Curated annotation (Swiss-Prot):
Record-listed CDP binding positions: G12, L13, G14, V15, G16, A17, K103, N104, L105, R106
MF terms in GO: magnesium ion binding; nucleotide binding; riboflavin kinase activity
Identification of the protein by name: Riboflavin kinase
EC number: 2.7.1.161
UniProt keyword terms in alphabetical order: Flavoprotein, FMN, Kinase, Magnesium, Metal-binding, Nucleotide-binding, Transferase
Chain residues that bind FMN: T90, E98
Pathways per UniProt: Cofactor biosynthesis; FMN biosynthesis; FMN from riboflavin (CTP route): step 1/1
Gene: ribK
């Protein structure tokens, strides 16, 4: 069963583009998307993993030694298919959702810091029905 979360758009740490580029090949292989080089960050104000205990993530292996795996949860943000990614090694708190898509979400959806958005997150096995 999908979960719905609301959160606030926030600026990231400025390294999302670098890491999306590093993981681009494995995101393409395991998720079937060629991601935009960057992430959209959403602060949900609480620990994300409280909500995901009932959801199965897709585990993305690291593209090379020295990097960690990534948990990927499929979802929908304002009508656009996305993935919530939770890197196993990160400087973000558990309250921050990092979102990847094949689109520049800030530009496509005209989002600014402090905008409130709702995101629907699915079990990775249910995503094919969207």
């Amino acid at each position: 069963m999908p979960i719905k979360l609301k959160g606030k758009i926030v600026s990231g740490l400025g390294v999302g583009a670098k890491y999306v580029q590093l993981y681009r090949g494995v995101f393409n292989k395991y998720l079937g998307i060629d991601p935009y080089p960057g992430t959209l960050n959403i602060d949900i104000g609480q620990d994300f993993f409280i909500y995901t205990k009932k959801l199965k993530a897709k585990i993305i292996p690291p593209p090379r030694k020295g990097l960690g795996c990534v948990l990927a949860y499929p979802g929908i943000l304002m009508g656009i298919k996305i993935y919530v990614i939770k890197p196993c090694i990160t400087n973000h708190g558990r309250n921050i959702l990092e979102i990847i898509s094949d689109k520049n979400l800030r530009k496509t959806l005209n989002l600014k810091d402090n905008d409130i958005v709702e995101i629907i997150i699915y079990d990775e096995e249910d995503y094919s029905y969207i």
